[in-house]
């Protein structure tokens, strides 16, 4: 196999697809059970009351309610607080 590049060839031209990470529901927004709140790599945000964590560290609502961001013990935490109408 030749290891020299041929005429007008390139070793570039590849790129990976975006992972579409980030906050999907912001503070004060109303969510239903099962709705994704944050897609993340690692635990930038930790699950609080009414929030579950998937195996890829995705945070999702366990109950319907309003999303609240806060801190607990120096960690960023997300809670889902039930909305009593």
UniProtKB/Swiss-Prot annotation:
InterPro entries, per the entry: Ribosomal_bL27, Ribosomal_bL27_CS
GO biological process: translation
GO cellular component terms attached to this protein's record: cytosolic large ribosomal subunit
Polar residues biased stretches: 7-19
Region (Disordered), start-end ranges: 1-21
GO molecular function: structural constituent of ribosome
Xref: SUPFAM superfamilies: Ribosomal L27 protein-like
Transmembrane residue ranges: none
Keywords: Ribonucleoprotein, Ribosomal protein
NCBIfam families for the chain: L27
Family indicated by similarity: Belongs to the bacterial ribosomal protein bL27 family.
Name of the featured protein: Large ribosomal subunit protein bL27
Record gene name: rpmA
């Amino acid at each position: 196999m030749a290891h020299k590049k041929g005429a007008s060839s390139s070793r570039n031209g590849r790129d990976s697809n975006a992972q579409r990470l980030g906050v999907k529901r912001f503070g004060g927004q109303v969510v239903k059970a099962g709705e994704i709140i944050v897609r993340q790599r690692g635990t930038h945000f930790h699950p609080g009351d009414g929030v579950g964590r998937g195996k890829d560290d995705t945070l999702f609502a366990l109950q319907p309610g309003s999303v609240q961001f806060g801190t607990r013990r120096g960690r960023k935490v997300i809670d889902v607080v039930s909305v009593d109408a």
